Amino acid sequence: MLLPIPDVLTPAQLSQLRERLDAADWADGRITAGHQSAQAKDNAQLPEDSPIAREASALVLDALSRSSTFFSAALPRRIYPPLFNRYSGGQSFGYHVDNAVRYDRSRGGADPVRTDVSATLFLSDPESYDGGELVIEDTYGTQSVKLPAGHLVIYPGTSLHKVMPVTRGTRVASFFWIQSMLRNDAQRRLLFELDVSIRRLTQDTPGHPSLIQLTGVYHNLLRQWADV
């Protein structure tokens, strides 16, 4: 399921985040890439262990915790701490597939995170740069994504994807991965659509007895499928 989620960051959060990132020291993004990705990757990345990266990551995680749409669509069990990248001067990231497992070392260990869902949070206004589209090979064809600052897109971690060259301006984004309670994308899509329908029915016909039944179906399916 490829899903744009608008306004994950408030204007105040976005301004605070950009202020921190604009003052940061960036490194060559290939340092953190795997063998396959390093051959396709040309960007700058904020070192994961820098104080600014940790502060910015915490801000993004706090914003995600307040997004009911994100929770409903991703059903997160674990979230890899958000990372940050920057593209300018023709930089790009060729077609690649994300590693199936990432190791979260933010708490001193090496906790595995299965990358069921990939996510990109756009931090630059689309009018401020040319190119930089996130191109995703989806089951429904090729999708090109370039969202307003503060908007998020999530998509299956199995997807082949790339970032087009940025030919003017600078594209800054956060990217991260989610280990979902449901590793199967079709099951996540089904439960998301069911949850959206329940929410709409609750608004249109509050108190309808069928809502209790539908809510029960949702939770029973989640109980059957969830890996917790």
Swiss-Prot record:
Binds 1 Fe(2+) ion per subunit. Keywords: Dioxygenase, Iron, Metal-binding, Oxidoreductase, Vitamin C. 2-oxoglutarate binds at residue 171. It is an enzyme of class 1 (oxidoreductase). InterPro entries: Oxoglu/Fe-dep_dioxygenase_dom, PKHD_C, PKHD_hydroxylase, Pro_4_hyd_alph, Pro_4_hyd_alph_FE2OG_OXY. Residues 78-180 form the Fe2OG dioxygenase domain. Pfam families: 2OG-FeII_Oxy_3, PKHD_C. Transmembrane segments: none annotated. Fe cation binds at residues 96, 98, 161. Signal peptide: none annotated. One of its GO terms (biological process) is intracellular iron ion homeostasis. Its EC number is 1.14.11.-. Its cofactor is Fe(2+); L-ascorbate. One of its GO terms (molecular function) is 2-oxoglutarate-dependent dioxygenase activity. It comes from the Bacteria. PANTHER family: PKHD-TYPE HYDROXYLASE YBIX. This is PKHD-type hydroxylase xcc-b100_1388. It comes from Xanthomonas campestris pv. campestris (strain B100).
